[in-house]
Every structure is written in C-alpha cells, then in structure tokens.
C-alpha cells in the first residue's frame, strides 16, 4: 500500500503460536482453551481456526466450547470447498434489485465447523481468499455463492455481530453487485463481484495466546484468534507480505470500519470506455498536426491521472492504464 501506516486500536490479534501449542500438548489444541480465550474479553471475539471434526480428546471438549459460545457472541470461520457438501448455517440476505448470484464467486461446497459449534455461535463467516493473477491477495469477496445460498466473509460477519443486526442487504444492478449493507451501518461499496480492495498499511495490537490468557490487552472492540505456528498454518501472499487468516480478516475488517478501502464502481468500465473514445476522437481530429495532438495526449494523461487520484480519495478505484495505452498506440 502507498498510504501511510496507521494503528488500529479497535482490533486485537491473538496468535496461537508454537510456544502455546507446545504448552498445551500439541495441535490441534483442546477446544476448551478456545472457550477460556473468549471468556477473557469484553470485545466481540472471532476464531479463524477450522474445527470440522470432533475433538480428538472427546466430546466434552466440544461441549465445553459450545457452552461458552452460547453465552458469548462469537464468530467462527469456515472455508469454501471444491467438494459438494450440505452447506452450513447462513444468515438471511435480502437481495435488492437484480439477482446477485450470477456475479458472485461460486463454490460447490464449504468446509464447515462442527455443527454443535456452528449452531452455538452467533455467526459464521468465510476466510476464503481469491488471489489475483500474480498470486497476491488484493481483493476479498464479501459474499460468495454456495449452492444458491449467500455466505458472508468472516470480517463482514464480525461487523454484523458487532452491530447486532440480524441480516444483510446486497444491492445488485444489471452491471453487477454495487454494494452490501448492514442495516445499522453505512453502505459498503463493492466491485461487480462483491469484492473490496484491502489495504495493508495497518498495524494492530497483538498478543501471543499465552500472554493473552494471563492478561489481555484491554480496550479492543474486536478480538480475532488465529494460528501462526509454523507447519500448522500457511500464510497467504499479499502486497503487505505473507499474512495469516486472522491478519487478512483484521485488515479487511479495519477497512470496512474505517471506510477507507477503495472499491471499483459498477460504472467504471463504461466510464473508462467513454473516456477512451473521447480521447481517440480528439487525437484523430488533430492527428495531422503534432503541435495539437501531442499537447492533447499529454493533457489527457494528466487529467486521467488526476481523476484517478481524485476518485481514489472518494473511495473509488479506477484503472486508466488501458485507456492511456490505447491512446499512446493511436
């Protein structure tokens, strides 16, 4: 990110690291420890660890966590799967306008949490990412389509549970998804596929799980737990370096709260095409006179760059590189 580094005081990251895992007897850790963790905070907790199968130590561990989930508003995670499944719990979503499903990322199934845990939680959200062509994660889908059901991302679910809203609204036009709205929260603009750009310039307060259980950092609104132990969790490449699942969701959640994550508006392609046509027509009219065509080309490039930064400041992301390239070739 080219933005200056900022510090987020609303989100605390808790790392389940090698030392903690060794101290509790190995991985996967007993589920009851997650129950102890979420009891230690007054914030909204979220756990990005997948727990699809019963605890190896017995069902008592699962029930210990489920009992705490019943008492404490907590968000759990699940991930998209290439294998068809029966799906999982999903929050009701009101579709305003066109059907959003043809525009959304679609998966055959999901790897869900153990039902006793998912049913006891206040929300379940996806931690699935969609890398760009260069392998880096820059944009994250806020909603995906699995079996014609709409599932929110983990960060969006954290925000919904934090605001106490029961559902979402997804606004779709003929050109794709335009925005997602939590009723008591400002509208979140997205690209046509319900993705938002994520900024990577945010520093979060973080603790190891061992230190957190002894004395948690106070003052956070959200606490997100994730595994960082080498050989257990694999970080995902991003423009800000490799990030673990809870780090990615924290950056996404920060952007949703701050409202500073730029999005590609649904009218972007139309606007870029219209500008390209206008510039080409101007260059065509002045093509026989370099004293006119050169200043027009340079002025157009300057205006495009200025316009891009202007709209970036408004939260819109426009890609004018193609327009400039076409004008240069002309």
Predicted regions and their residues:
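Non-transmembrane functional regions of envelope-associated proteins
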Residues: 1-186, 217-293
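A diffuse structural propensity rather than consistent per-protein peaks
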Residues: 30, 208, 319-320
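Short linear interaction motif-like sites in intrinsically disordered regions of transcription factors
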Residues: 64, 104, 198-201, 310
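Short, isolated positions within intrinsically disordered regulatory regions of eukaryotic proteins
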Residues: 67, 107, 201-204, 313
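Intrinsically disordered, low-complexity regions enriched in Ser/Pro/Gly/Gln/His and often acidic
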Residues: 96, 190-193, 302
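Intrinsically disordered regions, especially transient/low-confidence alpha-helical propensity segments
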Residues: 100, 194-197, 306
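Substrate-access "cap/lid" subdomains that shape
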Residues: 170-215
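Membrane-embedded alpha-helical segments, specifically the hydrophobic cores
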Residues: 298-330
């Amino acid at each position: 990110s080219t933005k200056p580094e900022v510090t987020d005081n609303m989100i605390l990251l808790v790392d389940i690291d090698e030392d903690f895992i060794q101290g509790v007897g190995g991985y996967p850790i007993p589920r009851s420890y997650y129950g102890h963790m979420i009891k230690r905070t007054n914030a909204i907790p979220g756990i990005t660890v997948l727990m699809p199968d019963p605890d190896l130590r017995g069902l008592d561990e699962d029930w210990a966590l489920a009992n705490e989930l019943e008492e404490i508003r907590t968000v759990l995670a699940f991930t998209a799967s290439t294998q068809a499944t029966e799906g999982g719990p999903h929050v009701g979503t009101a579709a305003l306008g066109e059907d959003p499903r043809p525009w959304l990322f679609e998966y055959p199934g999901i790897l869900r949490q153990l039902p006793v845990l998912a049913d006891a939680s206040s929300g379940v959200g996806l931690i699935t990412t969609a890398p760009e062509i260069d392998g880096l994660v820059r944009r994250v889908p806020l909603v995906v389509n699995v079996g014609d059901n709409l599932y929110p991302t983990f960060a969006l679910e954290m925000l919904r549970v934090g605001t106490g809203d029961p559902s979402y609204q997804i606004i779709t036009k003929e050109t794709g998804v335009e925005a997602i709205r939590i009723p008591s929260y400002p509208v979140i603009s997205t690209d046509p596929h319900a993705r938002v750009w994520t900024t990577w310039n945010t520093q979060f307060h973080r603790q190891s799980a061992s230190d957190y259980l002894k004395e948690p950092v106070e003052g956070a609104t959200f606490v997100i737990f994730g595994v960082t132990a080498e050989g257990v969790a694999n970080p995902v490449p991003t423009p800000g370096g490799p990030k673990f699942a809870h780090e990615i969701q924290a950056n996404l959640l920060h952007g949703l709260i701050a409202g500073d994550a730029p999005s590609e508006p649904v009218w972007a392609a139309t606007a870029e095409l219209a500008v390209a046509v206008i510039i080409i027509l101007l260059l065509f009219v002045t093509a026989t006179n370099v004293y006119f065509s050169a200043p027009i080309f340079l002025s157009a490039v300057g205006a495009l760059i200025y316009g891009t930064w202007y709209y970036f400041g408004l939260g819109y992301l426009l890609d004018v590189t193609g327009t400039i390239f076409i004008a240069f070739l002309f």
